[in-house]
């Protein structure tokens, strides 16, 4: 992994030698989540119940779907959905739902060979979403609605909001 920064998929692939053949979590640091039960613990409960890949999601406004990876999913239980597809930053008219993937994932090691075969996409980067789109076709995959307040710290306003909320 001596290549320059090549996308989130590449970053995950670079960790393969540390992860081996075990399930693992991906936590995007620009998504700050304030919750009574940590977001990852919410996902672990679903995973520990025998489910495969688990993505954390929250509903976003229809006009905001174009800023996120959006899951196409079927409701299984309250707050839990089986993923049937993923769309990266769709237009509001093309979005299959309003459930945005919010930077907390539990993935299986089956993602690694898929990432190795993933052609660089937008900005010539290996996109994790492209590999996830294939993985959800091959393995049981679920979206768990995260109970908590999310702040997009990758956005200046979101960063300021998180700073103020956590400082009070």
Where are these regions (language model features)?
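Catalytic-core segments of class I nucleotidyltransferases/pyrophosphorylases
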Residues: 25, 44-48, 77-168
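Conserved beta-loop-beta/alpha segment of the NTase-like Rossmann-fold superfamily
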Residues: 2-73, 109, 116-118
